[in-house]
């Protein structure tokens, strides 16, 4: 099932600020336990049979590493340098062979048709151009390769949508361009994948603006 919400087009992120980038890196590192509590079972199921070489868009502080098989190689596409020390610590902790790339999700620098799996968690909300990021995923995947994702999305009509609209601008400023109301389901469905499976679910917890979420797999 693919939920439909008003499509929000790409728009430039707020003017970057090093202190905000640092604060975001520290915030998400400190929230690793909460992410594990809320998304751990879903990530474990989605990542269970990934190949030994995986690209992750927006790897952040490495919250997904614990769900990869020890000995896996992770190519972490993460342009925020303030997360890189945490990435290295988590790679050592979970036995992951880590390669960090500072390129943006829209232009990873990886060769076309070179990988079998790309993952991302709560990333397409923040990239400057989600259409370009999805095109890049499709470009670097080999035929039959998988794009595995978990994303928060715009809500359908109701109180949560009202909260998203109310907080949209301050949220976007505080969280490095994160858009609360993107129609990511439609963007993935339109990205040219051979097969797309999307499951809407409710995140729950204290962060009401990101309650509506999706997870799934798209096959190149």
Give, region by region, the residue ranges found by the protein language model.
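Conserved alpha-helix/loop element of class I SAM-dependent methyltransferases that forms part
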Residues: 33-53, 63-67
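Class I SAM-dependent methyltransferase SAM/SAH-binding core
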Residues: 55-56, 60-107
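A short acidic, Gly/Pro-enriched loop at the edge of an enzyme's catalytic core
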Residues: 106-118
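A short SAM/SAH-binding and catalytic strip from SAM-dependent methyltransferases
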Residues: 116-129
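A short glycine-rich, Lys/Arg-flanked "PGG" loop and its adjoining helix->strand segment in the class I
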Residues: 131-143
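Conserved beta-strand signature within the Rossmann-like core of class I S-adenosyl-L-methionine
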Residues: 144-152
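Core SAM-dependent methyltransferase catalytic element
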Residues: 197-220
């Amino acid at each position: 099932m693919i939920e439909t919400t008003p499509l929000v087009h790409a728009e430039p992120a707020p003017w970057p600020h090093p202190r905000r980038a640092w604060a975001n890196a520290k915030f998400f590192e400190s929230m690793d336990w909460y992410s594990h509590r809320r998304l751990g079972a879903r990530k474990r199921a989605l990542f269970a049979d990934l190949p030994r070489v995986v690209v992750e868009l927006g790897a952040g502080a490495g919250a997904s590493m614990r769900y990869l098989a020890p000995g896996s190689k992770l190519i972490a596409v993460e342009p925020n340098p303030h997360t890189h020390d945490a990435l290295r610590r988590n790679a050592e902790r979970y036995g992951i062979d880590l390669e960090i790339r500072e390129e943006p999700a829209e232009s990873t620098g990886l060769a076309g048709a070179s990988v079998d799996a790309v993952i991302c968690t709560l990333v397409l909300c923040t990239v400057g151009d989600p259409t370009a990021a999805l095109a890049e995923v499709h470009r670097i995947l080999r035929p039959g390769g998988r794009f595995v994702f978990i994303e928060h999305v715009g809500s359908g009509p109701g109180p949560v949508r009202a909260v998203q609209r109310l907080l949209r601008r301050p949220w976007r400023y505080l969280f490095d361009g994160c858009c609360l109301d993107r129609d990511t389901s439609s963007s993935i469905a339109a990205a040219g994948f051979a097969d797309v499976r999307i499951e809407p679910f409710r995140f729950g917890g204290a962060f009401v603006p990101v309650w509506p979420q999706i997870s799934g797999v798209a096959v190149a």
